A protein has these predicted regions:
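Interhelical loop/hinge segments that connect adjacent transmembrane helices in multipass membrane
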Residues: 1-15, 205-208
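Junctions where cytoplasmic loops transition into the N-terminal start of transmembrane alpha-helices
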Residues: 4, 8-11, 44-51, 85-98
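Helix-terminus/linker motif at the lipid-water interface of multi-pass membrane proteins
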Residues: 13-57, 113-115
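C-terminal transmembrane helix end/exit motif
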Residues: 23, 189-208
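Helix-loop junctions and terminal segments of transmembrane helices
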Residues: 55-79
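Short membrane-interface helical motifs at transmembrane helix boundaries
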Residues: 100-124
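Membrane-interface junctions at transmembrane-helix termini in multi-pass inner-membrane proteins
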Residues: 133-161
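Membrane-interface helix-loop junctions in multi-pass transport and translocation proteins
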Residues: 150-153, 163-197
Length: 208
């Protein structure tokens, strides 16, 4: 039991530490790019408080999928029943939810940016970053399925690698005057893509 709990605790610690690092690193690097301190903090607030919550909208559905699917996957693993077909159905459903949410973000981006948040600069962020919605949804579900198969240690190693990559890219890119906040977005997107790719590889290697 402890061997399962420790990696999960580690992942929560990594997530918390990453938020702390981002809250200090991104504004500091944006200032180096030439933005005043107040503007750098405002841009970071737009990223963390406006963009990210919208991109994570499907999480209330994907969390439910994880809660239902993970125990069934564990049961099939214990019984020696093939799991790959179940994994395909779950990921297919998740992808459909993510794609629908992506289209929704694209269509309603002007309403979200101009009416809800009253931030015109948020519109291009939403439009360009909406492709991350299905990636983030899939990452969340794949992580839940891996936990159901007892792959918490693998999930932790992937999270550590992806977060380290994200920090390094943010440090390098967010300070570029031609990128600024887009540098942080690129770093975040790269980390999400790497997380999904490595997690899918580990998941399919574990199921049959």
């Amino acid at each position: 039991m402890l061997s399962l709990a420790l990696p999960l605790t580690g992942m929560k610690l990594v997530s918390s530490l990453m938020r702390t690092v981002q809250s200090a690193l991104i504004p500091a690097r944006l200032q180096i790019s030439g933005l005043p301190a107040s503007e750098a903090l405002s841009r970071f607030g737009m990223l963390s408080g406006m963009l990210m919550p919208v991109l994570m909208l499907p999480s209330f559905i994907t969390c439910s999928l994880c809660m239902v699917a993970a125990p069934e996957l564990t049961r099939r693993q214990a019984n020696g029943t093939p799991q790959r077909s179940l994994v395909r159905r779950i990921l297919g459903g998740t992808l459909l939810v993510g794609l629908c949410a992506m289209v929704g973000v694209w269509l309603f981006a002007p309403l979200i940016a101009d009416t809800l948040y009253r931030q015109a600069e948020l519109l291009p962020l939403l439009r360009r970053c909406c492709v991350l919605v299905p990636v983030m949804a899939l990452s969340q579900v794949v992580s839940g399925l891996m936990n159901g198969l007892g792959l918490q240690g693998t999930s932790l190693r992937i999270a550590l690698f992806a977060n380290l990559l994200s920090v390094l890219l943010m440090y390098a890119l967010a300070a570029q005057p031609t990128l600024q906040l887009w540098g942080a977005v690129i770093a975040m997107a790269a980390a999400q893509a790497v997380t999904l790719a490595l997690s899918l590889r580990a998941l399919y290697a574990a199921v049959r």
